[in-house]
A protein has these predicted regions:
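Short sequence/structural segments immediately N-terminal
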Residues: 20-501
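Juxtamembrane interface at the cytosolic side of transmembrane helices
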Residues: 497-512
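Positively charged n-region of N-terminal signal peptides that target proteins for export
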Residues: 1-4
């Protein structure tokens, strides 16, 4: 390397010849030496792809690279390969090249494995949070907030920083309570935060302090409780709307489950009734109708943990607040239930409204068999225990189930008939219009079950029953039309046949 550099400085070797004309003229000879370096086997340290990327850099970025090499912030070809291997867009590359902290800590010849930023931390035995790819995608880095914002010091200086005074003492690595206050220095300051995102709230710390997580961490000093980096990460913090963010909707269950699905972490924590806090929530959620929608089908409208429990003020919904959580999405069901007789009964027994019938984390898709009044049926089992003197309830539940069953059966029958009529070339649009009305009425009827009122339910079901009648009438008309077409076709074929016979006989007569 030294011999090559000497030749370059002496002008004995043309720079372009060393890199296939991919290194622009004017590049500092020291930088060229790194770009063209070879390992002991003679293989180029900087791959062609990274050389091509270097050649695409604008003058400003090449000058910053020249300066980094001249100041010996970038000292080796391996170090340069790491920087170029990121292949960042110009804005991010400029931020990186002006951050001596990140540059120095990505030098494998200077840093220990524990302190080395690299493109593959596991390969170097470094912690996962030392991934340089995460650093350059971090929301703080992209906003121009450098390492010094948390660690202290001056990122434009090579050394001489004062982060030792600003960064918490080593013993704080065993006490995580300081982290929330540390992050709150900025995130609780509206004036500071509004420079970057005016819509971002600044009350996270205030909410966290009073939450079960906050009380466990700050009052009980139990480090098993999560703090900011438990959910958001360390150097790879991304906006919640970024699919790679740990708090992106589809990743929230995994993030919460890191603690709540770990028996060791959750050992000793109890519910309000004194029972142990379960660790089955994540598995139950994944199998639930909500989990399948969010994780299976990618429906971001489906709720994750934080939609029901909250974020920084996360807490288990109490009996009185469960319905309010559910009503954020299921507003019609909640409104109907509030006006029903069941509302008072649930209040009297101190039952959580929605979860009493549907469950919480293991919510399965609601089905009509839930209305069964026999043994094992949801309605039947509850009413046998709590409403033995109300036989009209059983009659109402049976009516609900029978009516919905008849409409559902009619829907399936009409779909099959409609497809057969379409295959015969008949116009089925009027029938399908009534099918749409029936489908809407069926959905509405299932919602109106939550009124637990026969009269209210009948109002929702009536349009569906009428749609069945109208559709059946149109089906009969279509069948009659098809029969008429068949008769007409047969008559036409017969007429044509007779005509052909007559012509044949006439031709025979003429031949004679």
């Amino acid at each position: 390397m030294k011999a090559l550099l000497s030749l370059l400085l002496a002008g004995s070797l043309p720079i372009a010849a060393l890199a296939g004309a991919k290194i622009p003229a004017g590049t500092d000879p020291k930088l060229v030496a790194l770009l063209t370096a070879r390992d002991e086997s003679g293989k180029a340290v900087i791959p062609e792809e990274e050389l091509t990327y270097f050649a695409s850099l604008n003058d400003r970025l090449r000058e910053l690279l020249n300066q980094a090499v001249q100041k010996e912030v970038i000292t080796s070809a391996a170090h340069l390969r790491t920087v170029l291997g990121l292949q960042l867009r110009p804005q991010k590359m400029e931020l990186l090249l002006q951050n001596n902290c990140a540059l120095c800590h990505s030098d494998p010849e200077v840093q220990s494995a524990e302190d080395l930023f690299s493109l593959n931390p596991a390969a170097h035995g470094a912690p996962s949070h030392m991934n340089l790819k995460d650093v350059v995608e971090d929301v703080h880095f992209r906003s121009g907030l450098s390492c010094a914002g948390c660690h202290g010091g001056d990122p434009t200086a090579a050394l001489g920083h004062n982060f030792v005074k600003e960064w918490p003492e080593k013993e704080r690595g065993r006490n995580r309570a300081w982290i929330v206050g540390f992050c709150a220095r900025c995130h609780s300051d509206p004036t500071f935060m509004h420079q970057f995102n005016p819509a971002l709230p600044t009350d996270q710390f205030a909410k966290f302090k009073d939450s079960p997580h906050g009380v466990t961490l700050l009052v009980r000093h139990d480090d098993r409780a999560p703090q900011c980096i438990s959910c958001h990460g360390v150097h790879g913090i991304r906006p919640a709307k970024d699919p790679q963010s740990r708090v992106y909707p589809q990743r929230v269950p995994e993030t919460c489950g890191a603690c709540h699905a770990n028996p060791k972490t959750m050992a000793g924590f109890t519910q309000p009734d004194g029972s142990s806090l379960p660790t089955t929530q994540l598995a139950e959620y994944k199998a639930s109708v909500h989990g399948q929608a969010l994780l299976g089908r990618g429906d971001l409208g489906a709720p994750a943990c934080n939609d029901c429990h909250g974020n920084h003020a996360a807490s288990p919904p109490g009996v009185a607040s469960v319905s309010h959580s559910c009503s954020l999405c299921h507003s019609a069901n909640a409104s109907l239930f509030d006006g029903s007789k069941h509302k008072q009964a649930f209040d009297d027994h101190n039952w959580a409204e929605c979860s009493k019938c549907h469950g919480n984390h293991a919510i399965s898709k609601a089905h009509d068999s839930m209305l069964a009044t026999g043994p094992g049926g949801l309605c039947g089992d509850c009413h046998r225990q709590y409403a033995k003197d109300h036989p009209e309830c059983v009659m109402t539940a049976n009516y609900f189930r029978d009516t919905i069953g008849q409409m559902d059966q009619a829907k399936g029958r009409l779909i099959t008939v409609s497809e057969k009529l379409a295959a015969k070339g008949l116009d089925i649009e009027p029938i399908n219009n009534h099918l749409t009305e029936l489908t809407d009425a069926l959905k509405r009827s299932r919602t109106y079950i939550h009124s637990f009122s026969r009269n209210t339910f009948e109002q929702a079901a009536a349009p569906g029953e009428e749609a069945i009648k109208q559709a059946d009438t149109l089906v009969e008309k279509a069948r009659s039309e098809y029969k008429f077409r068949q008769i007409g076709l047969a008559a036409s074929i017969a007429s044509i046949g007779l005509l052909m016979i007559a012509i044949y006989l006439k031709l025979r007569q003429l031949e004679k």
